[in-house]
Amino acid sequence: MLDPSSSEEESDEILEEESGKEVLGSAASGARLSPSRTNEGSAGSAGMGGSGAGAGVGAGGGGGSGASSGGGAGGLQPSSRAGGGRPSSPSPSVVSEKEKEELERLQKEEEERKKRLQLYVFVMRCIAYPFNAKQPTDMARRPRKISKQQLQTVKDRFQAFLNGETQIVADEAFMNAVQSYYEVFLKSDRVARMVQSGGCSANDSREVFKKHIEKRVRSLPEIDGLSKETVLSSWMAKFDAIYRGEEDPRKQQARMTASAASELILSKEQLYEMFQNILGIKKFEHQLLYNACQLDNPDEQAAQIRRELDGRLQMADQIARERKFPKFVSKEMENMYIEELKSSVNLLMANLESMPVSKGGEFKLQKLKRSHNASIIDMGEESENQLSKSDVLLSFSLEVVIMEVQGLKSLAPNRIVYCTMEVEGGEKLQTDQAEASKPTWGTQGDFSTTHALPAVKVKLFTESTGVLALEDKELGRVILHPTPNSPKQSEWHKMTVSKNCPDQDLKIKLAVRMDKPQNMKHSGYLWTIGKNVWKRWKKRFFVLVQVSQYTFAMCSYREKKAEPQELLQLDGYTVDYTDPQPGLEGGRAFFNAVKEGDTVIFASDDEQDRILWVQAMYRATGQSHKPVPPTQVQKLKPRAETCLSMDAPISQFYADRAQKHGMDEFISSNPCNFDHASLFEMVQRLTLDHRLNDSYSCLGWFSPGQVFVLDEYCARNGVRGCHRHLCYLRDLLERAENGAMIDPTLLHYSFAFCASHVHGNRPDGIGTVTVEEKERFEEIKERLRVLLENQITHFRYCFPFGRPEGALKATLSLLERVLMKDIVTPVPQEEVKTVIRKCLEQAALVNYSRLSEYAKIEENVGRLITPAKKLEDTIRLAELVIEVLQQNEEHHAEAFAWWSDLMVEHAETFLSLFAVDMDAALEVQPPDTWDSFPLFQLLNDFLRTDYNLCNGKFHKHLQDLFAPLVVRYVDLMESSIAQSIHRGFERESWEPVNNGSGTSEDLFWKLDALQTFIRDLHWPEEEFGKHLEQRLKLMASDMIESCVKRTRIAFEVKLQKTSRSTDFRVPQSICTMFNVMVDAKAQSTKLCSMEMGQEHQYHSKIDELIEETVKEMITLLVAKFVTILEGVLAKLSRYDEGTLFSSFLSFTVKAASKYVDVPKPGMDVADAYVTFVRHSQDVLRDKVNEEMYIERLFDQWYNSSMNVICTWLTDRMDLQLHIYQLKTLIRMVKKTYRDFRLQGVLDSTLNSKTYETIRNRLTVEERTASVSEGGGLQGISMKDSDEEDEEDD
């Protein structure tokens, strides 16, 4: 805002130059304005009262003369162009038509400009002197909205983070969360639309991310010493760092603080500037209006309000007299309407009366308090409330500053002098002491007095040098009678010199400043005469005193008196200029105050003083007639003369300047003559446009400053509350219908107010309802219903990701309110449910249509679509469908909590639309292909975890669709596995593969994969799922049984083909077959057991089969080992006593030993057997995976071996063992015993009775042999010894 006291002449010169240029330009073009020049005239100098040849087109409406002088048809004819050139258009009629349209357009623009200027005058007055409203401090702060450019910047920052281009350290979980947020939220077209609608703020982005990560963090595993809340806080801090980028957080915080402050309280200058922008007012126009309206003068503004309120009361009386009422819904409301008008004015009067009588500079908008308890003023009783003299006591502050004294010539230079000062009846003050050679002080004394004409005494003293002197000597004195209008600067005054002072020309320089009390509006000397007071024509000192906002008094004072001598209460008087009265001498400029039965004549000494007095009294009387001076001495002159002659006050100067520029009509217009309903409608609409285009995400909410101005305008100009809210609703609806984000809570407030008013509930105390209000309300109610239903239908796009927070819930609440027939009876829930159901059914179609369209855009329609591609697209579409349903649950379910069953229906409808595309894709798939199972798994995994959708309509359809496929798949898999078993065992090499053979591994893998696949389907229908499980368990049992039997047969065949001598080595295949049994037993536990307690039959059956088979295999292998042992014993049987071989062998050895050293029978047989046993033990121990089976095998093998040896010895009980037999057996038995003990066979098994029998027999035979054989057994003995152990090793 420009300073009102700034120089006006410069802007005036600029305006005059522009005006001159325009006129010249018009003349040069043959009195025809070009469109561009016309625009300049309209924008820059419109309203200046142009009188040039063509000024009427551009600015004729502004000054009142342009339209008549320049608006004639001659100036617009094509033939009037300068130079007589060929016309640019071949058709003059076409040209004239265009120019006519241009003229009409310019006239409309001019009318609009005038309307805005007039509206700005009313708004300025509301800002300058508010007495009804204040800027609210409890409104929620609106966050700054995100622009398209800022959204792109945020996207780039997150993309840079994901690309690793930032310094922010993050783990994989956070990276995944940000990636998901970036893809789902930031890149969403719904977010772009929200930004475009002006409803997206940084807080929205942050809250969506916070909600997005909460589930992720909750699902993370617990970490010791690290709480989930800590992780959340850390992630949010990193998010903020990414979102902020490289920007200094301190700058951002400072900017946010500043913006928040501007959202709260605005100064007057800021409010002026805001509404200049809203109404398109230029700075110089504001300056002219500001000065001419005297907006910095609270007295003038209060007087303007009083005049307006008086005019509104008169208008109410006129309406009552002429019966020009608005059309009400009831005839009885007409009288009530008049009462309401008067009551509203009385309330405003009470508010005005409660305002403090203060200066404009001390007035603060935010300190304004509205008085609701002030008594209502009854204008009819004002004359009875007479003032007493004590009611108008004034208090003045005086400053007396003594500067210096001149004329002290007789005093010695070093004599001390000083001054005293006093106000009559008050205390006395003294200056510092000074030497007579330099009597200067600059001392100020402050006094207060209740005298309107106080006497200020200043005395000059010098210190007495005499010994007997009791008092200092007075040199001189001066007595002054200051008034608030006296000069404030220091002046020289001649002092009255004391008798004994030789210096007769003493002067003192001092200043006396008398401040004007806040309730003193003007003062000065006037000549006056009246009928009831001031009955003699005499010059008196007058003070215009404001007792309250509605009570003023003209008081005359004498010197040294606190109370007025006489006073005149100005209620009901009208002041005006008059001509000089004959017979009254004294006074030059006359004016009077007239009231029925009384006239008071005043006269001042000059014209300027008269104008000031009339202006002050005009404000005080509250009269509607504005006095106009008969002659205006002050005229606008060139700058050089302006400063030299100022006979009129500055307010008249500004008024003249405003008149010159065509502004006087806006300033002097009577507000009561305007249709403030339409004017307010305009200013509210323009304010809303301005608000929606500022940098805040306001959602339609006005700023506190805007609310304040609109509130004040409505109160001051009598705009009905219902009209205000109906206009607001209409404007908000228009914006919402055009895509702007509007807070439904705001709509709810205004709608509830209007509904309450229309149904007679008097929300603002107004009981009258006009037909227009009711009709408009019904129209807006229908529009609002359509809008709300449309928003609910498009809830994913109108409230993306649940933003703004709570908006969808508020929309549903508002819809319920709109559906109410009145404000008392709640609408039946079924009716609301029907409406919402219809909306959500349409929403399903809208959401799926947009989703499928989005999917097709991604899939590049136009390519040849194969069944596989169609299935792939359907799976992608299913992922998007699930994502939509999850977002609905996450962001919108809370709003629909009261209608959760309808949201379930919405989801089912949405899925049914998808089912059509899904069925079509599955129909074209070739038979016996299983690529569609991932689609089932994807959908079923989502549906089965949703309480509302599990086993719902679509879920059952999905099961019905895939159940035959699953059955067919299991059948084919069973056949395939059976064939693989048959073929596999035919070609089985029994080479070890993992835990078994190739065939068994393949079998178990297929069975496990099949069961895992079916289990991962998580079939939701319990009975069919149980059937599938039983089917697969039975299949596994049958397959494993077949595997076990085939292995048992192969085992036996393999053993039959192996050697029966000690050369036998346990082949790898034998161990593999054992391992197949081991693996079969382990797999059967997993593959054949049912979870239910009564369903263990499959598992127990196959378990028993495996155990029996393993026993048989162990028995067969032990039998093989026994056969080999029997072969060894058969060789030893040759040495039985009495046999031919034994006799021949003994004879041959004895005969040969006489000639050569014949070697005795060695231990080859025993060593071969021991080697066989050890090798077989090692192979079995190393290759067979089941320890229990090894132990059982070794136990049985040991026992069987001992039994065979024992039987063999028992058969030779009557025979003495040959020395060779004895040595071989001792070695075999001892080594077998030790080897089996090393393999872990228990001592209880090793030291069996059979073993003891064998040991005893061999011990006895050993003793016998040692007696009969001279050489003994050559160190072989049943006794244990270390040497033997070393030898064996």
Swiss-Prot record:
Give positions of region: Disordered: 1-107, 1264-1289
This entry carries the following GO cellular component terms, namely: cytoplasmic vesicle; dense core granule; extrinsic component of neuronal dense core vesicle membrane; glutamatergic synapse; presynapse
Q: Where in the cell is it found?
A: Synapse; Cytoplasmic vesicle, Secretory vesicle, Neuronal dense core vesicle membrane
Region Mediates targeting and association with DCVs: start and end of each range?
Answer: 1113-1289
Compositional bias ranges of the Basic and acidic residues kind:
96-107
Its tissue distribution reads: Specifically expressed in neural and endocrine secretory tissues. Expressed in brain, pancreas, hypothalamus, pituitary and adrenal but not in heart, placenta, lung, liver, skeletal muscle or kidney. In brain, it is absent from the cell body layers of the hippocampus and dentate gyrus but abundant in the synaptic neuropil, except for the stratum lucidum and stratum lacunosum moleculare where it is not detected. In the cerebellum, it is mainly detected in the glomeruli of the granule cell layer where it colocalized with synaptophysin.
Give residue ranges for domain C2: 378-493
Kindly give the Gene3D superfamilies that the UniProt entry links to this protein: 1.10.357.50, Pleckstrin-homology domain (PH domain)/Phosphotyrosine-binding domain (PTB)
SMART domains found in the cross-reference section: DUF1041, PH
Q: Where is this region: Interaction with DRD2?
A: 788-1065
From start to end residue, where is composition biased (Gly residues)?
A: 44-75
Query: Regarding domains, what does the record say?
Result: The PH domain is essential for regulated exocytosis and binds phospholipids and plasma membrane. It however does not mediate binding to DCVs.
The UniProt subunit note reads as follows: Interacts with the dopamine receptor DRD2. Interacts with RASL10B. Homodimer.
Tell me what this protein is called.
Calcium-dependent secretion activator 1
Question: What organism is the protein native to?
Answer: Rattus norvegicus
Q: What is the lineage of its organism?
A: Eukaryota, Metazoa, Chordata, Craniata, Vertebrata
What gene is it encoded by?
A: Cadps
